[in-house]
Each structure stands twice: as C-alpha cells, then as structure tokens.
C-alpha cells in the first residue's frame, strides 16, 4: 500500500535524529566532581544509552518507536521546567540540578512506563455490559461474546500460546452468539497462527451461530504481502463454522437479525449504505449490527440497529497518541455509547494489541453483552 521509503527508511532516519537529539540533551549534565575525574562517564554514558536506544528502535514498526516517544516527551518536559526555572530567576545550582534530573529521570520514567504498559497489555479482561430491550428475544435474553482486533503474533499481546486462556474466558461467558468484529488476523499473521485461531473458534459452543466481519487488516496489505490469502481465511472460517458477512443481513430462526458490514477503509467507502442493508427499516426484530470501525452510528440506528458492535481503535492503546488519532476519525474510541433510546453502540478495546506487547490506554479484553427483554 505504501512506498518502502515511507514505511521503513524514513522512520529509521527519524529514529537516528532523535537518538542524536537525546545524546546532545544528555550532555547538558553539569560536570560534577566524579565526571570531571572520569570524563569518559560524561560522554560515554549517554553514548551507551544512545546505542541502547538505537538497538531498541531497530524495527521502525516495533516497540522502539513507543520507547523513543515516551523518552523524548519526558526530556521535553524536564528541559521545559529547567528553562522556566532559569527564566523566573532560579539559582544556577538549582537550574543545573533540574538539568541533571532531566538527564536521568526520563530514562527511569520511560523504563517504568514500558514495564507497566507490558503488564497492562498482557492482562486479558472480560468486560461485561448489560442492556435491555422491549423487543422479543429467545427465552427473554441474549448473550453475545465479541472478539475483536486480535492479530496474533509473538511480539503482540496475543498469539497461539494464549489460546487456552482465551478459550477458558469465552467459555465462562456461555455465549449464545459469537461475533468477530475484524482484524482478527493481519498481514503479519503466519499460517500456523491462522489455523490455530480458526480451530479455537471451531471449538467454541455458540448455539445461535458465529459471525465474522472483515477489518482493515484482515486482507488489506498495509505493510507487507501476507503469507495467507482470502481463500485460506474463508476456508479456515468455514471449517470452524464461522460465517463471513460482507454487507449481509441474516435472519436467525429465533427472530434475531444479524447485519455484517464491509469495512469502510478496506472498501474505500464503497459499501452498501445502512438503509440498503435493511430496506424495510426498523421493525420488531432485535438487530445486532457488526461494523469493524465505529462510524456511521446514527445511520445504523435509523436503519434499525439495536446493538452496534465495533472495534478497530484498540481503545487508543498508546496514550495520548492513540486517543487523539482515533477520536479524530471515529465516533467512539472505547466503551458504550447510547445512540438513540433504542440503540446502543459498544466499541471493544481489542482482544490483543497491534504491533507490540504494550498498552497504556484501553483494555485487552473480550466483550460479553447480556441483553434482557423487559
């Protein structure tokens, strides 16, 4: 999709420039007595840290960009405080002390953030929502489990080694319906991971069925050519008893309607309108609306959607960059939102993480929605 220069070369140039910036910033440290006696410490320590940073950042799509981003942010904050102190008349000794802290503290804070973000990413939660409706439901209730934005790989929060944990949490919810709202796989997914997760979906007992809508990564080549194709995905889903919905409306025997939309980005917006998916408009059938990206909520509600389930945002994943980017493009970043008196939207934070085992915003979760007829 993108030229290799913008994907890989430009990020490396930017990473190198930031490394040099951090090195120069570190040299602002005052030449203390120990440093004066051992000049190698004054120049060698920041150089060593710069080399460490360069090693961490060797993959422009990896965790290094997150590490550098936090480190630069903390450096800027510290330097800003030091310059402010100088401007308001702080003593030279005090200002130098701030500069010293500006050299050491960002590394300590960044190390803590990286540790905490990893723990947060790897903690798989079950998030439960309770909704009521006046429409008829099978046995007066409906329980839906939503899986979204998994993309399994060794460097991310979810891979085949965590399938037993995921299976246990899904089974504990006892779903009537299993829905997979896109980006379950991506262009970095290996065939073995595809097969393992499709096998998992086949093992899940969901009496009312299992449904899948595509996201912008499942078959869309953002970064590289994937090692599997559409036929492989369709075959794996079919074997697992999962139905792929692409601008499709399905009526279940129990009277519940499932609508699955094509992804907006994957199709460049070339998809059916909400009204075209339910030509008759709202009726007395409870309608579950699956759309990978949280957008077009009002039109979906007007067409007859009672519950909209989406993903895509990862709940922001890396604060604040993720929050700013997602809010700008989507109608909801994470969680539950009341669209109308009869329609509710829920956006998952993702059952995995994108790119790396790191999360400072949102939750790594499966979503369990309990709908009761009143």
PLM regions with names:
Residues 1-124:
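Non-catalytic terminal accessory segments
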Residues 85-105, 109-173:
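N-terminal signal-anchor transmembrane helix
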Residues 136-374:
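Soluble catalytic domains of enzymes that build or remodel membrane lipids, polysaccharides, and related
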């Amino acid at each position: 999709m993108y030229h290799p220069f913008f994907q890989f070369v430009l990020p490396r140039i930017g990473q190198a420039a930031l490394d040099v910036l951090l090195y120069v910033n570190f040299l602002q440290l005052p030449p203390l007595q120990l440093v004066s006696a051992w000049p190698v410490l004054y120049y060698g320590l920041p150089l060593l840290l710069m080399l460490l940073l360069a090693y961490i950042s060797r993959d422009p799509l990896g965790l290094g960009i997150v590490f550098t981003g936090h480190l630069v942010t903390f450096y800027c904050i510290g330097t800003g405080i030091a310059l402010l102190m100088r401007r308001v008349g702080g003593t030279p000794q005090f200002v130098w002390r701030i500069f010293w802290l500006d050299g050491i503290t960002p590394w300590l804070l960044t190390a803590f953030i990286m540790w905490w973000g990893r723990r947060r990413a790897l903690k798989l939660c079950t998030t439960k929502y309770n909704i009521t409706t006046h429409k008829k439901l099978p046995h007066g209730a409906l329980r839906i489990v939503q899986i979204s934005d998994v993309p399994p790989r060794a460097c991310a929060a979810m891979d085949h080694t965590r399938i037993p944990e995921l299976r246990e949490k899904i089974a504990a919810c006892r779903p009537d319906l299993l829905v997979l709202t896109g980006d379950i796989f991506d262009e970095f997914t290996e065939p073995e991971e595809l097969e393992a997760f499709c096998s998992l979906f086949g093992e899940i007992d969901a009496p009312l069925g299992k449904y899948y809508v595509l996201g912008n990564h499942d078959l869309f080549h953002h970064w590289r050519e994937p090692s599997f194709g559409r036929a492989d995905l369709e075959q794996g889903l079919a074997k697992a008893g999962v139905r792929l919905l692409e601008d499709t409306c399905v009526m279940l025997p129990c009277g519940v309607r499932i609508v699955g939309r094509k992804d907006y980005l994957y199709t460049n917006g070339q998809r059916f309108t909400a009204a075209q998916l339910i030509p008759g408009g709202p009726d007395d059938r409870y309608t579950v609306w699956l759309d990978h990206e949280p957008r077009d909520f009002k039109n979906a509600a007007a067409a007859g959607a009672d519950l909209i389930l989406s993903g895509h945002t990862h709940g922001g994943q890396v604060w604040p960059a993720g929050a700013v980017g997602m809010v700008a493009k989507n109608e909801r970043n994470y969680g539950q939102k009341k669209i109308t008196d009869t329609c509710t939207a829920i956006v998952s934070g993702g059952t995995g993480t994108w790119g790396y085992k790191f999360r400072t915003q949102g939750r790594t979760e499966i979503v369990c929605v309990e709908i009761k007829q009143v």
